[in-house]
């Protein structure tokens, strides 16, 4: 377990970077966040959690939720059913690209861009009676926090600005790769993105990625092989168009969200969550990436 002093050092080290990024402003509910926040939490495979900075302050997890939705789909479907509808390749286009969906005849490149996550939400919607409730149940169980909830204001705000995601869903539907009612699936998808969690919650919830598929309670969520495969996808496609840069600087599987959170994993050891709302040009937390880079250097850890 890293010492508390190291986590505090990591937070202090990146503080001068504040002001260099830009808070996501495409929906009003995200634009109002205090840009000066910085937090980090780590959870070890032994179940210990340590944090520094604003690590107990909840934020909108946004695309980090795509890890949970894919994990949930893996517990409900045969893998062939999932991968026949969504690919495993890095995108190279923006996370909300319509062009790629058109060129590749309705099959999204990976589950971590919007098109791919919408297909996963469609799969969950068709298999579960109450997909929003099931997701809430899962993340509360994984984080050991019954107070985790959806931020209704964020979900509503995203729905009001959903034209592009609706266009992606209808385009996939035209290619036969979207079964459900678009409006219903969009509402489910936006609720997933609007989950509100803090760094401690997320570092605990993602521990299964570091612990061969076993959650913080020791329950097997997905198999060891599936965990390794999921980490491989996170390493290649978890950070939008910044995945290569992140692999170079941090060297861990990770997933970011435009709320400023990033989760990362050192397999066999620990799961990490950092948060700083200001984003770089790729939509990844600027100071968050720097925190992970500094931590990986100080710990001497990389998967490469």
From Swiss-Prot:
Record's keyword terms, sorted: Hydrolase
A Pfam family assignment: Glutaminase
Xref: SUPFAM superfamilies: beta-lactamase/transpeptidase-like
Residues holding substrate: 63, 114, 158, 165, 189, 240, 258
Reaction equations catalysed: L-glutamine + H2O = L-glutamate + NH4(+)
Residues spanning the membrane: none
EC number of the protein: 3.5.1.2
EC class: hydrolase
InterPro entries assigned: Beta-lactam/transpept-like, Glutaminase
GO BP, one annotated term: glutamate biosynthetic process
UniProt family annotation: Belongs to the glutaminase family.
The protein's assembly and partners: Homotetramer.
NCBIfam families membership: Gln_ase, PRK00971.1-1, PRK00971.1-2
GO MF, one example: glutaminase activity
Organism field: Shewanella baltica (strain OS223)
Protein name from the UniProt record: Glutaminase
């Amino acid at each position: 377990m890293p010492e508390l002093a190291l986590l505090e050092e990591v937070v202090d080290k990146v503080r001068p970077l504040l002001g260099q990024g830009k808070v996501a402003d495409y929906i009003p509910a995200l634009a109002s966040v205090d840009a000066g926040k910085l937090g980090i939490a780590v959870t070890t495979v032994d179940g210990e959690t340590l944090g520094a900075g604003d690590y107990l302050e909840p934020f909108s997890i946004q695309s980090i939720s795509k890890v949970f939705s894919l994990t949930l789909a893996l517990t409900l479907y045969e893998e062939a059913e999932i991968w026949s509808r969504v690919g495993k390749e890095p995108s190279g286009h923006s996370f909300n690209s319509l062009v790629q969906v058109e060129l590749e005849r309705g099959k999204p490149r990976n589950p971590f861009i919007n098109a791919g996550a919408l297909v996963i939400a469609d799969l969950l919607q068709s298999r579960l009676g109450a997909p929003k409730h099931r997701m809430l149940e899962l993340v509360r169980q994984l984080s050991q926090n019954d107070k985790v909830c959806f931020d209704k204001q964020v979900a509503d705000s995203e729905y009001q600005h959903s034209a592009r995601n609706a266009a992606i869903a209808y385009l996939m539907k035209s290619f036969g790769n979207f079964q459900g009612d678009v409006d219903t699936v969009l509402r489910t998808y936006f609720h997933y993105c609007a989950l509100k969690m803090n760094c401690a919650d997320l570092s605990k919830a993602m521990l299964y990625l570091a612990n061969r598929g076993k959650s913080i309670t020791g329950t097997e969520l997905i198999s060891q092989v599936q965990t390794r495969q999921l980490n491989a996808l996170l390493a290649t496609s978890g950070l939008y168009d910044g995945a290569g840069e992140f692999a170079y600087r941090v060297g861990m599987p990770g997933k970011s969200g435009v709320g400023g959170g990033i989760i990362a994993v050192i397999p066999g050891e620990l799961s990490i969550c950092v948060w700083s709302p200001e984003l770089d040009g790729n939509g990844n937390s600027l100071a968050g990436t720097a925190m992970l880079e500094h931590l990986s250097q100080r710990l001497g850890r990389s998967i490469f």
